[in-house]
């Protein structure tokens, strides 16, 4: 009986391992590419941004610049190039040098930070591969969230990503992929908080 139990455990682990490897292989076939910026040697990215939070609407310029040892410098510019926010991002954490209290409320700041986290780092912690109707779904763990990318069958680039954790959900939409400085990236990105409280639309102006 002990021998049979050991054999059963070995077979279970073997098949789980095979399934995991198969999922990992399938998740990269055809080789997928994810909408991230400044991960292939690019030094700067500039977006035109529009943010909606309740009845409040704001237009601004979002500037991202590479610094030392993987650090990213972040600036938000308003009218007449006035600096509205200044921060750095490294290893998944933000450090703010300048952030007026009335620029973002708590929900809007959370959506803004989650947007940048997903656009500045490649997804790594693979969780699941699934084919559903005409879509391929590939999920990764990202901090406390599960990020699920949606690909149309045969496509290399995703058109949508759903970020979820319990009742906290966001939708990312990637539209109009174009070649910028040798890298294929979405020209427009829309991020919407599931309860409709906050939405951010980014239009890529340059990637160098």
Role assignments for model-derived ranges:
Residues 78-83:
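Membrane-embedded segments
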Residues 62-66, 87, 174-179:
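Extended lipid/amphipathic-ligand handling interfaces
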Residues 134-208:
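Gly/Pro-enriched, hydrophobic low-complexity segments
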Residues 84-85, 100:
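Short Lys/Arg-rich amphipathic alpha-helical segments
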Residues 17-65, 70-71, 102-106:
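N-terminal leader/targeting segments and the immediate start of mature chains
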Residues 94-126:
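Acidic/charged, solvent-exposed loop-and-adjacent secondary-structure segments enriched in E/D, K/R, S/T
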Residues 1-18:
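Sec-dependent bacterial lipoprotein signal peptides
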């Amino acid at each position: 009986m002990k021998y049979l139990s050991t054999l059963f455990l070995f077979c279970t682990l073997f098949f789980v391992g095979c399934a995991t490897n198969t999922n990992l292989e399938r998740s990269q076939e055809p080789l997928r590419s994810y909408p991230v910026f400044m991960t292939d040697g690019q030094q700067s990215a500039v977006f035109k941004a529009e943010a909606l939070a309740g009845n409040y609407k704001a237009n601004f310029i979002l500037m991202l610049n590479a610094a030392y040892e993987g650090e990213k410098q972040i600036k938000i510019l308003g009218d007449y190039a006035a600096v509205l926010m200044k921060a750095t991002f490294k290893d998944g954490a933000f450090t703010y040098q300048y952030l007026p209290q009335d620029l973002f409320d708590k929900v809007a700041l959370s959506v803004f930070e989650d947007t940048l986290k997903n656009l500045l780092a490649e997804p790594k912690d693979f969780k699941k591969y699934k084919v559903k109707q005409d879509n391929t779904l590939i999920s990764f763990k990202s901090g406390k969230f599960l990020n699920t990318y949606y690909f149309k069958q045969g496509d290399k680039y995703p058109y949508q990503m759903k970020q979820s954790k319990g009742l906290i959900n966001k939708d990312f939409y990637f539209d109009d992929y174009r070649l910028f400085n040798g890298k294929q990236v979405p020209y427009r990105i829309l991020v919407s908080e599931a309860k409709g409280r906050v939405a951010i639309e980014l239009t890529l102006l340059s990637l160098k």
